[in-house]
Amino acid sequence: MNLEVIAQLTVLALIVASGPLVIALLAARKGNL
């Protein structure tokens, strides 16, 4: 595999994983408040 392909896959994985994480953090902050 090329480094470019690996880089694109890692970026996509981070974006997909960051979605639910951001929602969870916002929900946790609202819950704490």
UniProtKB/Swiss-Prot annotation:
For this chain, the family text in UniProt reads:
Belongs to the Psb30/Ycf12 family.
**Where does this chain mainly localize?**
plastid
> Mind telling me what this protein is named?
Photosystem II reaction center protein Psb30
Question: Does Chloroplast appear among the keywords?
Answer: yes
Source taxonomy lineage?
A: Eukaryota, Viridiplantae, Streptophyta, Embryophyta, Marchantiophyta
Membrane protein topology class: Single-pass membrane protein
Q: Which GO terms describe its biological process?
A: photosynthesis
User: What does this gene product do?
Assistant: A core subunit of photosystem II (PSII), probably helps stabilize the reaction center.
